[in-house]
């Protein structure tokens, strides 16, 4: 696994944009053969990205062939009827840890988990098994972030704000949550519904450690829909 120090990673990402490059099977850019996501990564790097967030073993392996940028890795795998699907069990952590990536992101919401563990117990098990691996908690509320930090994660990401039944539904990033997390002294990687450069600048000025932008850069269907809706 990657042995990068937390402070070294922060120095690499704190003043730039991490680009999320993903395509799920139901999305236009997904192909069974692969090969598309690395092209998005190359474009993002040429545009000045300081890091990449990516999903799946296949995509991450292909990405590592074309860039040396830091990678936040996840594996999206459904475990119905439970809702968490972002690196939801140790199985996914094991697969990601074998890829030698800088950060592994985990679902750290309070929702019922497939493995039956509490979030705190899951984090602690991961820390025991992979003590040098940097971890990012994908959360939707302040309380979830605080619990994850107490359990030992390195970063908290606002990835899931608006995507749990109990978090605020807003058409844009959860600025108030980001502000509160920064004021509490947490190492925040802001993510979720960041559609415009002005929003990224506002978030940067709050003191976050990193900013992840996905759909606004790498999902042309979503970008097109936003322009089409703007004409109505």
Swiss-Prot record:
The protein's annotated catalytic reaction(s) are: an N-acyl-D-glucosamine 6-phosphate = an N-acyl-D-mannosamine 6-phosphate
Q: Keywords in UniProt for this one? A: Carbohydrate metabolism, Isomerase
Which terms in the GO cellular component ontology are assigned? cytosol
Q: Which GO terms describe its molecular function?
A: N-acylglucosamine-6-phosphate 2-epimerase activity
Name the EC number(s): 5.1.3.9
Pathway listed for it?
A: Amino-sugar metabolism; N-acetylneuraminate degradation; D-fructose 6-phosphate from N-acetylneuraminate: step 3/5
Look up the coiled coil feature and give its residue ranges: none
The chain's disulfide connectivity reads none
What Gene3D superfamilies does its record include? Aldolase class I
Biological processes, Gene Ontology terms: carbohydrate metabolic process; N-acetylmannosamine catabolic process; N-acetylneuraminate catabolic process
* Function noted in UniProt: Converts N-acetylmannosamine-6-phosphate (ManNAc-6-P) to N-acetylglucosamine-6-phosphate (GlcNAc-6-P).
Cited NCBIfam families: PRK01130.1
Family per UniProt?
A: Belongs to the NanE family.
What's the protein name? Putative N-acetylmannosamine-6-phosphate 2-epimerase
Specify the species: Streptococcus sanguinis (strain SK36)
Instruction: Name the gene behind this protein.
Output: nanE
């Amino acid at each position: 696994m990657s042995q990068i120090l937390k402070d070294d990673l922060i120095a690499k990402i704190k003043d730039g944009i991490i680009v999320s490059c993903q395509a799920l099977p139901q999305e236009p850019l997904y192909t069974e053969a692969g090969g598309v996501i690395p092209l998005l990564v190359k474009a993002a790097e040429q545009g000045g990205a300081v890091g990449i967030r990516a999903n799946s073993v296949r995509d991450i392996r292909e990405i590592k062939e074309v860039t040396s940028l830091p990678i936040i890795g996840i594996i999206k795998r459904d475990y119905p009827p439970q809702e968490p699907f972002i690196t939801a069990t140790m199985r996914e952590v094991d697969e990601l840890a074998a890829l030698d990536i800088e950060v592994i992101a985990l679902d750290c919401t309070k929702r019922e988990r497939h493995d039956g563990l509490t979030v705190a117990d899951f984090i602690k098990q991961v820390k025991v098994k992979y003590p040098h691996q940097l971890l990012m908690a994908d959360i939707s509320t302040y309380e979830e972030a605080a619990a994850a930090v107490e359990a030992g994660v390195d970063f908290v990401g606002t990835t899931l704000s608006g995507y749990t039944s109990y978090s605020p539904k807003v058409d844009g990033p959860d600025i108030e949550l980001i502000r509160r997390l920064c004021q509490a002294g947490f190492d925040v990687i802001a993510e979720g519904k960041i559609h415009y450069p002005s929003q990224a600048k506002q978030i940067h000025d709050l003191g976050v450690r990193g900013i992840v932008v996905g759909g606004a850069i790498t999902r042309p269907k979503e970008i097109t829909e936003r322009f089409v809706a703007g004409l109505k």
